[in-house]
Amino acid sequence: SRIFNRIQKLEKRLSPEFFSSLSAETLRDAGLSYSKVGYIKGIAGEIIIGKFNLRGLSYLTDEEVILEMSKQKGIGRWTSQMYLIFALGRPDIWPINDLGVVKGIIGLKKLEEFETGSKEISNLGDIYRPWRSIAARVFWQYQNISKVVSKVEPQLSNSVRD
């Protein structure tokens, strides 16, 4: 999100034209790797010339969106799932390869370690159908809150002793 915030300081309304107009160095200065700069500029160019239609994705099924987006260099299943959840608002996406979701599941459910993409994580998502995107958001939030609590708890226990 730091990178996103740095880019938004340059322009509030992000567009393919905006990314195409930026120099690679400007994007690098915002924190993007050389490969991500190439991917972003390539995708922006594809959108501008009409070879990649983001608006048209909303008419496709979830799997069709993933297949279509994955044709773009630098976009895979995880990125496609994030687009489905956050841009298209699809309710039943279960991002089993997302580290935040897995950490949230482990913490909230007090489970043993799981690997991202594991069959156990995939199966666990079945109980949340057809609202797995919402469950994923809960696990992300839990994981984010846990980070804050783990930083604050030692300070609280020290102040109680004083």
Can you name each region flagged by the protein language model?
Residues 62, 77-162:
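C-terminal accessory module of base-excision DNA glycosylases/AP lyases that mediates lesion recognition
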Residues 1-71:
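Alpha-helical ds-nucleic-acid-binding substructure associated with the helix-hairpin-helix region
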